[in-house]
Amino acid sequence: LVNNPDKYDFSEIKTFVQNIGGVQKEYESKMDRVDLDPLQLIEDEEKFGNVKFNIKRLQDATHGVGGGNFVVIFARPEAGKSAFWISLVANKNGFAEQGKKCHAFINEEPAKKTYVRLISCWTGIVRDLIKERIDEVRKEWNLIKNNVFVYDSVDISMDDLNNYCEENEVDIIIIDQLDKINIRGSYNAQHEKLKEIYKQARELAKRNNVLVIGISQASAEAHNQQRVDFNWLDNSKTGKAGEADLIIGIGKPRDSDKDYDRWLYLSKNKLTGEHIDIECSLNHTLSRIE
């Protein structure tokens, strides 16, 4: 070997060594070291909750949310899931008025119906009066409409959403309903697939530095209950809940004689650790929760 090195072919060894270097580089590219001055860390955390909730007690309990967060809102059918996120987006002091680009992907009710509900929520004008007050509606809606994007998206996948974020200006993504989003792969059980959907929703938030809000159903145990916690997420005892930063259950109490009584319960709150019940009311005609 020493006397006649040209006789030997070291190409495979060279390739092996180069590949080791490539693996190390790929490994490092997946990590982002945190090494900042303590003051800088605190100031960055204070900036983090730059998306404010327009329900005071909810804002106080969370200090707001921001890019990289994954929030789950869930309830029984007809309890006000869509009305809640519509109110967070389009009610006064909501996400849209704060200047956040809100993109809603609808795979349950027709998206045109959702859009009308957003308009009513913002303007305070019920659907049946929109035509006769159209000039007023247009003037008011123009104030926030460039921050509200609504899509009919029955067959959309998580890959589609990642691509969408890369190509558009996005602050907030709302997925109504998250459980119906398509993902790659085959799964032995429904709960395994749902866990992966929620895992990918969290990754969608972190990878694109956006706030992701997923809307989901509550299981039958939550029917007529005031306090709805994450143990009642439909078809998942742990997998869904494990991925979220904040989980808000909407309760509709059995003993209430008022159809508009609602309770919000923060059964998971990694933002501040505060778990509270919030009494509120649902305005069906304006899709507002206040």
Task: Identify what each model region corresponds to.
Residues 1, 96-188, 196:
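Conserved inter-motif catalytic segment of the P-loop NTP-binding fold
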Residues 1-36:
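Short, small/acidic-rich helices and loops at N termini and domain boundaries
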Residues 25-124:
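The Walker A/P-loop phosphate-binding site
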Residues 59, 74, 89-90, 103, ...:
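Generic hydrophobic alpha-helical scaffold/packing signal
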Residues 71, 103-105, 151, 213, ...:
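Hydrophobic/aromatic beta-strand patches that form the interior of the parallel beta-sheet core
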Residues 106-109, 177, 210, 214-219, ...:
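A short beta-strand-to-loop transition that corresponds to the Sensor-1 phosphate-sensing loop
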Residues 158-173, 203-208, 220-290:
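C-terminal regions of RecA-like/P-loop NTPase motor modules
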Residues 180, 189-224, 242-243:
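Conserved P-loop NTPase motor cores
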